[in-house]
A protein has these predicted regions:
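ATP-dependent adenylation/nucleotidyltransferase module used to activate substrates
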Residues: 1-142
Length: 142
């Protein structure tokens, strides 16, 4: 069975979609403007959730729309494995990072995705149970 996509190109997608009340084309253009503003590398946090996926999509489209000669700085996508998620979620995130690296390489986009894991003595469970840290809440984070 052949896959059917709603949009034939990323340009068509940017023209048609609205995100948080703004045209996707505008958000991609704003990300592109910020990318070209200086030479400092970017580090993007990625959890695999809807918010970080949307941000990553906007940045990827901005880099894709940037002429190759202007893709002058690196973008690092970092996904931190908290060792709390289920194997299914961890594998989905790892798969997304692998696909992202492959596509960025194919399209000559200066973006690399990385999966990081804490040392065992710095894991969520070691901090919570071993060191006695209080559990994170909406108003308290480690």
């Amino acid at each position: 069975m052949d896959e059917a996509f709603r949009f034939a190109t990323s340009e068509e997608q940017c023209e048609a979609l609205v995100v948080a009340g703004r045209a996707l084309k505008y958000l991609v253009g704003e990300a592109q403007r910020l990318y070209l503003e200086d030479s400092r590398p970017w580090v993007i946090g990625y959890s695999g959730g809807k918010d970080s996926t949307a941000i990553l999509q906007i940045i990827f489209l901005a880099l894709l729309a940037t002429p190759k000669e202007n893709r002058h700085k690196s973008v690092y996508v970092v996904s931190s494995d908290t060792l709390v998620e289920t194997p299914l979620v961890v594998n989905l995130v790892k798969g997304a990072l692998l696909e992202l690296n492959e596509k960025a390489l194919d399209l000559d986009i200066p973006l690399t995705a990385h999966h990081v894991v804490p040392k065992s003595n710095d894991s969520f469970w070691a901090n919570l149970l071993g060191k006695g840290y209080p559990a994170p809440t909406q108003t308290f984070r480690w």
